[in-house]
Each structure stands twice: as structure tokens, then as C-alpha cells.
Amino acid sequence: MSDWKSMSKDELELQYSPSRWSPRMSADDVIRAHVSALKSGTERARSVTQTLMDVPYGEAEGEKLDVYLPSSSSPDVPLVIYFHGGYWQFLSKDESGFLAVPLVQKGAVVVAVGYSIAPKGDMDLMVSQVRRSVVSVIQQYSHISGLYLCGHSAGAHLAAMVLSTDWTQYDVSPKIKGAFLVSGIYDLQPILSTYVNEPLKMTEEVALRNSPSRFLSQLKVSSASCDITVAVAQNDSPEFRKQSEEYYKALESAGLKVSFEDVSETDHFSIIEQLVDENYLLTKLLLKMIGKS
């Protein structure tokens, strides 16, 4: 496949427009259906689990978490932090509890993280926020059996940036046991000239310092024992698939514990929507990762 640098702006825009690659429905319809699926899944999770809503992890208005709790607490409770997608400019924690039910039913705590999406927040701020959210969670839940991250699309990018954090600056060491990176972007340079960057206003310098693909040595120091799954949809665009494949290969070459899942019969949206289903491949893999299969 040709290098993104040789693509026209139109081709890059197409490659980085996930909704235009779904075989299920039109671009507008797939986004509408996605939002609807996330909202209804989150409403269900809120109705069947115990919740703590809008827990602050910082001073800013957008710095809040939603926590989904199992009905009985046992000593070995894994905690899964979810970072939502939406190209850093859409969606929020308020539709991000949909994956909680199968996890909470097995005794896990699920935390959905809010962050200041563009144009309110910029990329540096969002990366700082998700890092601080993890610090706050470990301080609040020191008794957990393990901390795990899950992120979709832009959220997978943010999760990968968390894995690449120099924690000495935060006086903590989270010891993240596992990370589930679903249909993410790990090199931000290709989107600089696309519509995606219009509200983000990233310069090349900002894109480079927030590209996980450039921080493998830090990830190796911070997250050496982390079990990482890189997942991609069969009907993700070739560029999205390439982002996941190349990041997976780089992690593997760096000697990290990483596996690759190419999920058949999914697109960029259904690959994450189906986490509501305990029998879905990725749900089973996530439950296995957190020791609750």
C-alpha cells in the first residue's frame, strides 16, 4: 500500500473517514447508529449496575469519571478504564458505559473517563487529562487486583499515550497489567492535513509529541509487563489497518507482550459496539485478560 505522504488530500480524507468504509450503511447512518448503540448500552449499564457519576479527577469542567461497580466487592477486583473515541472532538463519557455490563457482572469495576474534546481542549491537554485520570483512579482504588486500559479509535491513541507515560513526573507507578487498543491511531502525522485536524489545530510538533509510535522506548520502561492487545476491524480503512499493524509490529519488535486481533465481519464502529455482548470475541478476550473469563 502506498505511503500516506504520497496520497492526495482527498485520498487521505477518505482513508481517515471510518464511516465511509462500513458495508452496513451510509456514512451518516453508521455514525447515527453508533451513537444510538453507545447511548442505549450506557443507559442499560446504568440501570443494572451500581454507579458513581461525575467523579472529579481534576479541577476543569471536563475532568470527570463515571464508575460502574459490581454489586458485591471481592478482594481481587480488576479495574478497567475506558477512553472513548470520537476523533478527539465528539462523544463523551456519558455514552461510554456501554461495555460495563459483561465486565461488572464478572466482578470488575469499569471507569469511563471524560476529557476536554476539541475545540475546548487540545491534544496536549487531552493526553495530560487521561494520564491524570489514571493517577486519580489508582489513588481512589488502591485495593484492586489489576489496572487495565481499553480505548477505541482516538481513545486507543490516548490509552497508548498513557502506556508511554514517564510516571516519575506523577510520583506514582500505576503498574498497568493490560491494555486493549481497538482501531486506534498511533501516528498522528497523516491526519494533519485532513478535516480531522480542523478543530484540533495540531502543528507537526504537537502531532509528533503525541504520537505513541514515537515513544516505544518510554512504553518499554513504563509498561514492560503490560499485556497489550491491538485489535482492528476487517472493514477499517487500509490506513487504519496499517496504523494498527505497524504499531503492533513495533511493540513486538521492542520485545513487549502483545497480540494482534483482526476481527472479521466488523467495521470501525461495530468492533467496539459489540462489547455489550459477553459472547463477542473481544469481550471474551478482555475478560480473559482481566482474569475473569
Curated annotation (Swiss-Prot):
Give compartment(s): Cytoplasm, Cytosol; Nucleus
Keywords attached to this Swiss-Prot or TrEMBL record, sorted alphabetically, are: Cytoplasm, Hydrolase, Nucleus, Tryptophan catabolism
Reactions mediated catalytically: N-formyl-L-kynurenine + H2O = L-kynurenine + formate + H(+)
State the similarity comment.
Belongs to the kynurenine formamidase family.
Quoted from the entry, the domain comment is: The main chain amide nitrogen atoms of the second glycine and its adjacent residue in the HGGXW motif define the oxyanion hole, and stabilize the oxyanion that forms during the nucleophilic attack by the catalytic serine during substrate cleavage.
Q: Does the keyword Transmembrane helix apply?
A: no
GO molecular function terms noted in the UniProt entry: arylformamidase activity
Q: Name one GO biological process term.
A: L-tryptophan catabolic process to kynurenine
Q: Where is this motif: HGGXW?
A: 84-88
Pathway involvement of the protein, from the record: Amino-acid degradation; L-tryptophan degradation via kynurenine pathway; L-kynurenine from L-tryptophan: step 2/2
Q: Which Gene3D superfamilies match?
A: alpha/beta hydrolase
Superkingdom to which the source organism belongs:
Eukaryota
Record-annotated active site? 153 (nucleophile), 236, 268
Recorded protein name is: Kynurenine formamidase
Q: What are its GO cellular component terms?
A: cytoplasm; cytosol; nucleus
At the top of the EC hierarchy, this enzyme's class is hydrolase
